[in-house]
Amino acid sequence: MRKLLFIVTICLPFGYALAQTQPSPPRPAFDAELAKTVGADEYGMRGYVLAVLKTGPTPMPAGKERDEMFKGHFANINRLASEGKLALAGPFDGVNGWRGLFIFAVSDIEEAKRLTATDPVISSGEMVAEYHKYYGSAALMLVNDGHNKVAKKSF
């Protein structure tokens, strides 16, 4: 019995210590000005429109004309991003005709269609877009500025 009492007496403090949880780090302070800048609602979220770019009806063969079309495509992406209309863009692997993604910082599909129509890959028929509304973190609007700080080269 003494051994049991001794073991319990020794082990209790260790069990108590293990049961203590570490306090979670303090949450960053809410920045109302930043929230307004990125269009955040009270949950830090906002509406977007995803445009999934797929292979279109008239793919352009390799050559100078195609190179110019894609040069215009990248210029259009940069323009829309600098205007704050395009939160994110990038390519897919091309499997099943999925070529790329635009995440527009607009909540209306019709506006996203107008923006997409300004892109040479769409107007040429190289790609077509499929649209979906999306509700996500408004912090996504900070990606373009961050990207510019980590990219050595531009398209």
Feature roles, as predicted:
Residues 1-23:
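Bacterial Sec-dependent N-terminal signal peptides
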Residues 20-155:
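Conserved, structured core segments of small domains
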